Amino acid sequence: MNLEDLKKRQEKIRNFSIIAHIDHGKSTLADRILEATETVSSREMQAQLLDSMDLERERGITIKLNAIELNYTAKDGETYIFHLIDTPGHVDFTYEVSRSLAACEGAILVVDAAQGIEAQTLANVYLALDNDLEILPVINKIDLPAADPERVRAEIEDVIGLDASEAVLASAKAGIGIEDILEQIVEKVPAPTGNVEAPLKALIFDSVYDAYRGVILQVRVMDGVVKPGDTIQLMSNGKTFDVTEVGIFTPKAIGRDFLATGDVGYIAASIKTVQDTRVGDTVTLADNPATEPLHGYKQMNPMVFAGLYPIESNKYNDLREALEKLQLNDASLQFEPETSQALGFGFRCGFLGLLHMDVIQERLEREFNIDLIMTAPSVIYKVNLTDGEAIDVSNPSEFPDPTKIDSIEEPYVKAQIMVPQEFVGAVMELAQRKRGDFVTMDYIDDNRVNVIYQIPLAEIVFDFFDKLKSSTRGYASFDYEISEYRSSKLVKMDILLNGDKVDALSFIVHKEFAYERGKLIVDKLKKIIPRQQFEVPIQAAIGQKIVARTDIKALRKNVLAKCYGGDVSRKRKLLEKQKAGKKRMKAIGSVEVPQEAFLSVLSMDEE
């Protein structure tokens, strides 16, 4: 194609993504758009087509983002090229959202006609506004009996401040309003602005590992053209690769002769390891490089850390390979080897949040068949030592000696909880119990309230979300962002079995709750750890001080069964002998800790 044709083609390109809170109908809308543009034949159509992982389908959530090219013939008779970039809606996967928004010019904001705006809708809208995207509101599910499109329209205008007078009323399930959405994309979303003649600049927004072709980069071309045979260079580390193939996704990968400005597609260049390709990096040509990289999206840092150990210790290498493979597609997963006296060899992994942690654990067990033990999640604490040094600690067993600690700071989050009015009391009580500080409360409409709290991240990591859902019958929606570090009175609690510390059961707790947490855990462990031949004390300790203790009684055999009557000294001799045996056993005996014991530290409910 010559330059004129390329420029004409660029004017017909529309890049957009769909943003929504979980369950507001985003993936269904994407399905309808694919059908309406006849991208996918009716034979291949299946629900949630873009959610290609089994896990995504089962949980009904979108985890990875997907990019697809569609052709749409508009009412003006012209054919437009749409690139739909599907994004996750869950708070843990915001980094996936920020990546996909960096590749777009417009966003369709889907809001449920019955539920209205939710916390994550807001979070994603702000991300879109930061990226200067044109936002098209769509009020979905208008065929529901509880739908109230006018109220939702007013909400969009009041809470977000978008003009919703032209918002499309749609039902993705029933296929209503799909055409209007497509026409709005043509009219309102701007065409890409880049320059075809400039040196190549392409933003990597995802990478996938393919066993045959190496790492495949998913890119949005901002300036210039790339074609097979070119030598590309990555701007962050200067490495060069030869392009073997470029193409687009129409869910399936289809090879093309070139990718030009405004295109969204993939580049294969036999790249061996994913560590070479950072998501958010800029690809340029080695012989005609761009002068400066694109300002990509922000690098996400893990917030939650946990140890992962294989139950069978010979699976350690398999676990490492599995984690490396997952890391290929998931730039935000971090891990490093660690050892534990109780659990053997494993890895300390960093995750963006709890759902992310859950999903990774499930994928390891499901796709790689590795049975895992996971230790209690913890966050990064800043520990200020008495000699003036400050260290970051994410693993309770690495905490320094209490005598050397001057103060400990922990991360706080700003939590936005949107909830119907009748549950405000329950939410406030929960937040208070989790050491939250009240910030402010706004009414969104007559019934819904947006409550904002500052809460320690460590409290949210445990089971805040489940508790929130159960105390509000599932009506609350929740979104959080890290706000600051504050100093807190935190202590490290060790659990001792038979006088030995079990490092994997240590956890960090606020001084006020130390006693009850300790008591709770020793009581729980007592129920879980099987009785031994000797008595086993379970203790919770802070430093040298024991704060709670309980004993597991010994199993005993009746050694007197064979004495029929007879002399009392004979019986005493047998009992003394048994006692000495038990004592010897206790001195050398070790206690098997079942997997449930580690999980019980996690589900620390005040039951």
From Swiss-Prot:
Its EC number is 3.6.5.n1. GTP binds at residues 23-28, 140-143. It comes from the Bacteria. Gene3D superfamilies: 3.30.70.240, Elongation factor 4, C-terminal domain, Elongation Factor G (Translational Gtpase), domain 3, P-loop containing nucleotide triphosphate hydrolases, Translation factors. GO terms for cellular component: plasma membrane. It catalyses: GTP + H2O = GDP + phosphate + H(+). Keywords: Cell membrane, GTP-binding, Hydrolase, Membrane, Nucleotide-binding, Protein biosynthesis. InterPro entries: EF-4, EFG_III/V, EFG_V-like, EFTu-like_2, G_TR_CS, LepA_C_sf, LepA_CTD, LepA_IV. Belongs to the TRAFAC class translation factor GTPase superfamily. Classic translation factor GTPase family. LepA subfamily. Required for accurate and efficient protein synthesis under certain stress conditions. May act as a fidelity factor of the translation reaction, by catalyzing a one-codon backward translocation of tRNAs on improperly translocated ribosomes. Back-translocation proceeds from a post-translocation (POST) complex to a pre-translocation (PRE) complex, thus giving elongation factor G a second chance to translocate the tRNAs correctly. Binds to ribosomes in a GTP-dependent manner. This is Elongation factor 4.
